[in-house]
Amino acid sequence: MKMLACSAGRRMQFVVTFALAALFSGSCNASDPGSRERSFVKALELFDAATSANDYLASARELESILAEGFENGAVYYNLGNAYYRAGEFGRAILNYRKAKPYRPRDTYLEANLQQALAAAPGRLSEPAMPWWTHVLFWSDWFSHPTKVRLAANGMMLAAGFFLLTVVLRRDALLLLAIAALLGGSALGLEAWLSHLSRMNRGVITAETMAQKGTGRDYEAAFDQPLKDGAEFLILSQTADWTFGHFEGIGDGWVRNEFVAR
């Protein structure tokens, strides 16, 4: 089954999305938005002209350079996932598709490509249970992460405004509106924060390796089979050379950092 590719029109939509995000982003001051947009367009051109795994990796490197200074964008992550998938690096593809999800929660192309990468990954493990808060805070997939942050901030500002009006005008109805705005903003902010923490602790194996019971070559293997490309796991701790993680369905183990992407 072929990976769902972006049409020319959809690719142009990505460019526009990227340009707008870059203009309004304050997360990266060292690189100007124009430079990021040029790198993004160049990466798309490299992807379209690619005929080998190395060509797709060249596109991926161009996209990685955009993210190197902390900039985040759903279109960049999505296309980075596409480039790694075509290069045969399924673990990195899965990781970047998942990073794109909070920015494009209802993108059917993204979801289809993620599922295809998961199916192709030789090291795929059992899916962990959904966090409890995704059931309680049920709007988790309704809005993108930036939208949640903006709505949370607006809710807090509305709450402050209504509280001020309550003091000035002495009307109980305004107090109820203030409480509602405060609760709504707090709930959205909490969900955005929990989602961010969950993403920060996600890792994936990028090449076959044996997990160990400790941080040294003399320790026993943690599992009876090697971990392979695409094995996702929860990062529990990390040192300069090793990562300790929980691998769903098989247990906990240490792996060297060169086999881990996060």
PLM regions: where:
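SH3/SH3-like beta-barrel superfamily modules
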Residues: L227-N257
